[in-house]
Regions:
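Residues that scaffold, gate, or flank divalent-cation-dependent active/transport sites
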Residues: 25
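Conserved beta-strand elements of the Class I
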Residues: 21-22, 109
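Acidic, polar low-complexity linker/tail segments
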Residues: 1-21, 30-33
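…and closely analogous acidic/polar surface helices at protein-protein or active-site interfaces
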Residues: 18, 28-59, 123-126
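Von Willebrand factor
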Residues: 55, 64-69, 73-110, 115-117, ...
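Generic recognition of flexible, low-complexity loop/linker segments
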Residues: 7-11, 43-46, 96-98, 117-119
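Short, conserved, surface-exposed binding loops centered on an aromatic residue
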Residues: 9-16, 46-49, 70
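Alpha-helical subdomain
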Residues: 119-122, 128-130
Length: 150
């Protein structure tokens, strides 16, 4: 398996572990269609890795909805979106360093419209971050950027 920027594989003879924190923006500026598209992107990542994708799925607006761990598509499917306030990206990175120190994700994928101030890159603590944006207007100052069409 080729190792990419976001998907570091931890591999033994019979096991590959890919650990990603997916955070979906559920702020008031995100429509139901946008949230559904973001959720579908996460499901697509799980499907792409044939069940070998382990991770957490969380939601955020101005607060973190605690990420839920999943190790299978069935576990992923029972996680439901919550939120609806403003948007704060910094709380994601603070959450990771406060609550996930025992098992840091190999990467963080933030699915958002990007309409909020961006935190300083140093807060990521060296963890690769992908901003998965649903528009062409916003350009984060750091991390990798990908776009989805809604």
């Amino acid at each position: 398996m080729k190792e990419g920027f976001f998907v570091k594989a931890i591999q033994t003879a019979k096991y590959i572990s890919i650990v990603i924190l997916f955070m979906i923006d559920t702020s008031g500026s995100m429509s139901d269609d946008m949230i559904t598209a973001a959720y579908s992107e996460v499901k697509g990542a799980i499907d792409q890795f044939g069940g070998k994708l382990e991770g957490w799925l969380g939601f955020f607006d101005a607060a973190i909805i605690e990420p839920k761990r999943f190790t299978s598509l069935d576990e992923f499917k029972i996680i439901k979106p919550a939120g609806g306030g403003g948007t704060d990206f910094q709380i994601i990175l603070e959450y990771v360093h406060k609550h996930m120190q025992d098992k840091l994700p190999t990467s963080i994928i933030i699915l958002t419209d990007g309409y909020a101030p961006f935190p300083e890159e140093e807060l990521a603590g060296g963890i690769p971050v992908l901003w998965l944006l649903n528009n062409e207007e916003v350009n984060p100052p750091w991390g990798k950027i990908a776009r989805i069409v809604v």
